[in-house]
Amino acid sequence: MSEMNFETLQTFRRELHQIPETALEEFKTHDYLLTKLKSWQQDYMTIKTVEALPTAILVYFQGTNPVRTIGYRTDIDALPIQEATGLDFASQHPGKMHACGHDVHMTMALGLAQYFSQHQPKDNLIIFFQPAEEAESGGKVAYDMGLFEGKWRPDEFYGIHDQPNLPAGTLSTLAGTLFAGTAELKVDVIGTGGHAAYPHLAKDPIVIAAELIIQLQTVVSRSVDPIAGGVVSVGVINGGFANNVIPDQVHFEGTVRSMTRTGLETMLTRIRKIAEGLAIANEVTINVSLESGSYLPVENDPILATQVINFMQKQSDINFELAQPAMTGEDFGYLLQHIPGVMLWLGVNDSHPLHSAQLTIDESAILPGYNALKSFLLWRMATSEEK
């Protein structure tokens, strides 16, 4: 039985990096993970897959003297991005890339699985390989379909996410809300088209859409507590086909984010009311779609998070920083609404942000990240208190 080393983790990461797959299509990734897990099978391990969520995998390790069941979650999907890193082990799937570091997340989860296949844990341990974090709300789907019922329900859940802005191998979290809750905004402004020379005979959806986009910026500045914060950003707008034609319709899309559930609901209500008012004032139809409920704020349990922070701050071999809240969204927040837990950042030291086609993770982060997680889990299992 050998301890995990950098070369093994690096191999996992590079092999996974080459086969990125988007939400609910992670079949090669699933097969890769399942092959590794089955090769480490022990009598005290149970590997679970389900037809209703075919790319998900759960691994249950029966503890030797359990007082709790600890859960560890990793996401497994990639993004629809054409990789532009030039790496020797770049994506082999055109138009798809692990641009959010889920290859690194999976690597550390595999490292934990291999370790606990060689060292039976004291507490029960569940490792959840979750599909569809970037889209399709995989965490919510898994929870709502009953994947965590009975012995498969953790008493507490942990997870990690890469952070390019932190030094490689640095861990970071806080006892509170780490990530924002998000809602996806889609708007259709339906007016009346016509000749651009006669705007008075049309109901110009371009002008109305522009006015609506500007008005939406007041949602944060005038309806949200400045301490709580929020974001309304429009990233897509489409309308028109000729310079001398007023179109019938304009479509735009964006994201709405808040650090609190109440703040998010306030923002969604204001967006709907502003759209309704503009529709009446301009005698047009404005259809607003706001998809929320899956990407809730990632609210770390304060007691468990304090334990994580205290443990990591006391370890001489762990570099730890207290985190600041981020407007990043993560569907782990949905699981944490039902099961207490903690998400952490892992620094991967790159000048390119998450979701960049040029994101190049510093692989020296992987081993210290894995070792910190393993050390914390072993310490947690050695404590008898419920929280």
From Swiss-Prot:
EC class (word): hydrolase
Reaction it catalyzes: N-acetyl-(2S,6S)-2,6-diaminopimelate + H2O = (2S,6S)-2,6-diaminopimelate + acetate
Pathway listed: Amino-acid biosynthesis; L-lysine biosynthesis via DAP pathway; LL-2,6-diaminopimelate from (S)-tetrahydrodipicolinate (acetylase route): step 3/3
Any Pfam family the entry gives: Peptidase_M20
InterPro entries found in the cross-reference section: AcetylDAP_deacetylase (IPR023905), Amidohydrolase (IPR017439), Bact_exopeptidase_dim_dom (IPR036264), Peptidase_M20 (IPR002933), Peptidase_M20_dimer (IPR011650)
EC code: 3.5.1.47
Keywords of this entry: Amino-acid biosynthesis, Diaminopimelate biosynthesis, Hydrolase, Lysine biosynthesis
GO BP field: diaminopimelate biosynthetic process; lysine biosynthetic process via diaminopimelate
Active-site annotation: D75, E134
GO MF annotation list: N-acetyldiaminopimelate deacetylase activity
HAMAP family in alphabetical order: DapEL (MF_01692)
Function comment: Catalyzes the conversion of N-acetyl-diaminopimelate to diaminopimelate and acetate.
Family under the similarity heading: Belongs to the peptidase M20A family. N-acetyldiaminopimelate deacetylase subfamily.
Protein name as catalogued: N-acetyldiaminopimelate deacetylase
Source organism of this protein record: Leuconostoc citreum (strain KM20)
High-level lineage: Bacteria, Bacillati, Bacillota, Bacilli, Lactobacillales
